[in-house]
Amino acid sequence: KARPESTLTNWVADALYNQAIKVYTEPIAFAYQNYGGIRINNLGKGPVTLIKIYEIMPFDNTLVIVKLSGSEMQQFFDYMAAGGGSPVSASARYVIEAGKPVRITIHGKALDLTGSYYVAMTDYIANGGDNLVYLKDKPRLDKNVLVRDLLIKESKDKGMVKSALDQRVTLKN
C-alpha cells in the first residue's frame, strides 16, 4: 500500500462508496478510508477470501455518512494532503502541491465552499479518530453496517476485484 494511492486503497475506498450509495439515500460525495485502517499492503493474486477481507479490515467499524459544509470539506482535504494523501473513492480527486490540496473535485465539479456534502467513512474516523476531532459533533447517519461486511458484499457483487491507479490523488513537487 503506497501513498498517495495504491490499487488496494483505491479498491477499498471505491468499495465503500459503491456500498454506501446502496445503503444510504443521501447523495454521497465520496468515501474516505483512513490509510492506517487498511491493515495489509496488497491483495495479491487469486481469489479474495474471507480471511483476506478480515486481514484488510480486522476492526468492527461501521460505515457512516457525515454531513460537512464546503469549508469543512476544505479542512478535511487539508488534513489528507498534509499527511501525504489518503484513500478516497474515484468520485473525489485532488492534487497535493507543497503539502496543500489544490484542484479538488467532487463528481467532476470543483469543491463548492458554500455547499454541503455527505462523506462516507468509518465510525472510527467520524468519532474523531486519527486526530479528526472536529468530526465528532457533525451530523451523521449510521445504519450499523460493518465495513468488513460491505467489503465482502462488494467482492461478491463484482466477482473479480479490479482496481487501478487513476491519479485521483496526485502528488506534485
Regions found by a protein language model. Give the residues of each.
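Glycine-rich phosphate/diphosphate-binding loops and the adjacent beta-loop-alpha structural elements
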Residues: 1-3
